[in-house]
Amino acid sequence: MVMIVAGHAIVHGLGFGNIQANTNNNQFGLTYFEMNSFLAIAVNCFFWISGYFQIKRRISRAIELIVETMGYILLLNIILYIMNYSGVVYYLDILRIIKRVLFFYQGYWFLTAYLILFIISPYLNKMVEVLSQDEKKELLITLFLINSFCGFVLKIASLDSGFSVVQGVYMYLVGSLCRTDDIQNFFKKKGKILNVLFVIFGLLNGCAAYIFGSKGYNEVAWRMFSYNSPVIVFMAIVACLSVVHCSRSSKICDKLGKLSRYSLAAYLLTDYPLIREVVFLPLKYMNSMSDFEKILLIFLYAIMLTFVCMGIDSIRKCLYNYIENKLNI
């Protein structure tokens, strides 16, 4: 989640996402392209981990996620409305807030994709379970060819963008298929080599994006960070397998895993279009700093912001449980 927040800080806070439309990208040096190359894997990692450990669908949890999201959006819009309050309550403003709350999926593609994935996960899990080892490897290769080659390279309609439910299902299945003994044993033997390739591919991908951007190929430069890019997918798989193998012998990962239940607020508060401009406003005053200082500050700010959001979400959960207990009485 820290990686996702740091990615939001660069893309939305510093305006790095605008490189696809700008003709002059000199304001962003090679460092930003390299940094975003490694941060772009975070969303894929989230879906992959969900598939590896396999989601256990509970309707109550799906409803809870929807209610939490709508509650946060309502609260954020009320706060923004009060901050801009002119002394007159406009009917259209109220309707606009209601629309944003009810149609929250228009601003949160990632959460929407996860909710849909949450609903269909039992069927995906059963499909993977009945496949043989060879069939699983065949399916893994087929999915890669369809989404990462046909989608990213050939730009086939509805597959060319990684910002979709298709990408979520793709990475979920990849995560499930990586549970096979063959892949686990392969990673144990070649883990160090794969980790080196992870770093090399990340650096080369960022460098290529920077070169394309400096030559005026802005859309191509931004496309290098697409979630269905073969490089981004490969890096996400290697990163996740490394974490999974480390977590088997590390209690720290278990403790960090318990904190993930409070991570919803970090995503909701840093990716909402109306609020992220305020959240990342302090980062706009880093012009006089060196690139190294900027990167360090971005990560520190992302860590701080993540834990602040987790604190807010933990308070919300306490209030939710308190109200629920009172109602049960």
Label for each model-derived stretch:
Residues 59-60, 118-145, 177-197:
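Solvent-exposed interhelical
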Residues 27-47, 54-108, 112-113, 117, ...:
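Transmembrane alpha-helical segments and their boundary/interface "anchor" motifs
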Residues 166, 185-265, 272-280, 284-298:
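Alpha-helical transmembrane segments and terminal signal-anchor/GPI-anchor hydrophobic tails
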Residues 2-9, 72-79, 141-155, 198-212, ...:
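Aromatic-anchored segments of alpha-helical transmembrane domains
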Residues 48, 52-56, 117, 121-125, ...:
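Hydrophobic transmembrane alpha-helices
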Residues 136-183:
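Loop-centered beta-sheet repeat module
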Residues 279-285, 290-291, 316-329:
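Membrane-proximal cytoplasmic C-terminal regulatory module of class A 7TM GPCRs
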Residues 30-43, 98-113, 153-171, 206-237, ...:
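Interfacial loop-to-helix transition and helix-capping segments at the boundaries
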